[in-house]
């Protein structure tokens, strides 16, 4: 991907409101918050705020919105910069949902449509700058409390990336090359989102530069081709 094509892609994202600071107030909460996998269109009205999805998530990715979010108070969401969704086998969060807010027909990754990743400030990307991962950039992840082997595996992968060329967004993506891969821009590496991105948010979590966001409830075509 050359610089002209990259600028065209990011310009399209910015035009759709997903450039720097894309989290602007919207009229509908589902456009603001990243929901767990399988969230249905009318999630807001179906979620009974029971917290079952929160309890069963092995990565502790899901939280409940607080009073600051108004009518969304108590509904489940994912803060991708804190902890993305690792798209577990069998989707325990979906199976635990008693109200239908998370669609039980969600049984495989291809069923998931949480959103799509957006790279902003590409010139700050460590891969683009040809810089290694610095310990200070991943300290927040390494200091996270670990509760199980799955979380430990993520921590180990992050720890092993220190002082090496950065590709964490690509190497830890639970979808794989169909969602994100390293492309060339001006002869330098740069992560490129693809049609297979489901908006899980792992890339946003593990990015040392914190320059990846997730556009919730949006498709690849809406952001990059709209």
Residue positions per predicted region:
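Non-ligating segments of multi-cofactor redox enzymes
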Residues: 1-190, 194-226
């Amino acid at each position: 991907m050359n610089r002209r094509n990259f600028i065209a892609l990011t310009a399209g994202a910015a035009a759709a409101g997903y450039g720097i600071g894309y989290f602007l107030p919207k009229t509908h909460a589902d456009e603001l918050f990243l929901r767990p996998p399988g969230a249905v269109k009318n999630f807001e009205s179906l979620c009974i705020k029971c917290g079952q999805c929160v309890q069963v998530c092995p990565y502790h990715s899901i939280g409940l919105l607080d009073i600051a979010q108004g009518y969304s108070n108590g509904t489940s969401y994912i803060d991708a910069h804190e902890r993305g969704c690792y798209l577990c086998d069998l989707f325990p969060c979906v199976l635990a949902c008693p109200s239908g807010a998370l669609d039980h027909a969600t049984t495989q990754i291809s069923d998931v449509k949480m959103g799509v990743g957006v790279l902003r400030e590409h010139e700050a990307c460590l891969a683009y700058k040809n810089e290694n991962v610095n310990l200070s950039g991943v300290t927040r992840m390494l200091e996270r409390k670990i509760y199980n082997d799955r979380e430990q595996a993520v921590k180990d992968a992050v720890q092993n990336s220190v002082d090496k060329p950065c590709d964490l967004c690509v190497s830890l993506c639970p979808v794989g090359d169909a969602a994100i891969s390293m492309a060339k821009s001006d002869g330098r590496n740069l992560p490129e989102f693809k049609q297979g991105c489901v908006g899980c948010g792992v890339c946003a979590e593990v990015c040392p530069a914190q320059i990846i966001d997730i556009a919730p409830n949006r498709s690849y075509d809406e952001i990059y081709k709209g």
